[in-house]
């Protein structure tokens, strides 16, 4: 094995052209090149895939079937490979229970810290909760009315699996008669059979007492017995009121009896029933009917269909509508009054219903008349009940269309119950700690004052928390909170969290492969990331990074430039060497951008725009501080700011969703804002994301852009097709007729190999051509429909030269820099940047209205500087047609060519959410307090 280099011979994965590469070990190596050149194919699909495969191969066949096998990459040999870890941009988890704290394991250490050195305080009296004596317990019960029936219960087990047969036998021997199993009273002399795989709660009935004269001594004896059984906890159930009160020799308020169970780590978990909020079950939010989704237009009256649920019911004999009319009549609700003019009382009646029984008569569609007396539920409670009761997936979806996530009213989004939230360390409960930004949490932990005993107990726990918070802060994530949902993180944030976790593991001798870790990171924080990557290398690891960021490249030890072009024009090693060597290499486009020989020019003048605006007023979603923001129309607008400053919240959550709601009646609820002005100046809003254009092999660039319809029509007009009676549907691989039915038009068949990976083989029937033999006998210019789909966009331009309708559509795909991709290339093989440019090409084909707003979130993700230049050309074409482009971006090459910049900040998280400066790039560069301006000034000079 080579100790100094990773030697790759004959790599042919995807578009790699049988290349040989030598990569120095234990160094920071950057792989760069144009989008689609083959960087990812080499770094992830070859090097990482082979490292992972070798590890999996070392396991038994039994273990491999659970892990899933990994296909051997198409490469002759790789020598000098270490165990490989990939840190990519996939979001960590969409599970609503996953947070930054749980993903990084910091929350596990916090639970341990609060269980070991936490102190509970009564939420009402704010006094330290300490253990209760039996006398204090009896005094609390003494407050009940005389004649109250009481039941003393001892907690024997909580949320524990098993049949618990031994426990029941022991309780019988001890002379007990009754137990409460999972809330149900059972006699111990009967045969109690429990499911051993389910968790159970078991309380033994110690005594049943009626509160009367002389009962105190008996109650005290029973409490003592119960406390001995459980080691210090007992429940007294008030059978009259059906309420329970927990008493503890450990922790309880001396004034109101507020008790807290014994502090243990699982109590502080919102994934455990013991600690979770009983209302939202630890999620922090509830799916509830939303007033604005139920009543989209408040200017309408009920009779005008203002309540969307009844829109189809007005004027019909539907029972629900009849019942609702009875409710309105009973409370004198005016059905012709605009809903915006309703008083709170009137609104509460139509939403939540009556609080008293109403006598009314209903007639069914069959003519049956029924009379009843009962309260009538409001439309909101009706939908909520129907949603919970229905078993039909269609109905559930319909009811869900009126619902949105709302903060849980019981725990206020804190996820935990009252007992857990009463426990504090350093004056904060665990929820308050996780709601702080990582930067503030780190400062809090570093300055935490504990007594000598607590310090000895918590020393190691605090060290782990401090280290992990430091790593997260060091990769530029100091603005995040530990309570932030993992599913709401961007790809770049999720990747940097995994990066911080890996640094915490302090592994050595490992090969790390990273995919653009600088995504979503402001230049100000780039230095922190570079330092982190260098630290990983200095631990004795090989770090391979697929990256386009020039600062990262300059800080690297070695650069490998893959190219020279993309797709069929790429797949070769153009240049390799140190950053200094790359700058001198005449073959490397990357080197020319690094040296400054190539650069994206600054426009000589900025556009004036149409003079019209869309203005967001009172934006206060997430960390936005009630700001008013003007977006000029007919300009190239760039929204900038450090990570976490509120850019995505402003543009994606408020502006975009509000425009979609107004223009398309979208059911998505925009983020909190007062109003949006100027929407009459916009007739279309288009989000151009990097999401795939399709998720099946049948989706491809020509089906997405609509060119394939024209191509199929062309084939249907050929003499051979006319003679056979084929229409254009014959040339579709999505429907029966012309496609190969053996593979259903996919061209490949999947073969399940059980404990080996699934194998995809070309279809034996059509040989991977997707169509049946008869269809492939039809040709145009001696080419079959399959041959045309196999052409590159570049080649197809000359092939369709005399057909302007087809050629013009293909030209737009070529113009966005995708001349190298095939017409029928599967959508699943396109990168995010390529998918985004296919979408832009599709939009460029449409006639400009001058009233369209395009929204792009970090479009330079995955793009080389040369690709960025092309992207800017495309975006400028859109704006030159009179439309508006709004881009969220950190890339200075994009920011410097914008007509108007809206810079948010100053910092991220709580310290963000305000407008630092707004105006031309020159104005922003002149603003001394703007972090963006400071870096922009360098590239404008």
Tell what function each PLM region has.
Residues 1-941:
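Conserved phosphate-binding elements of NTP-dependent enzyme cores
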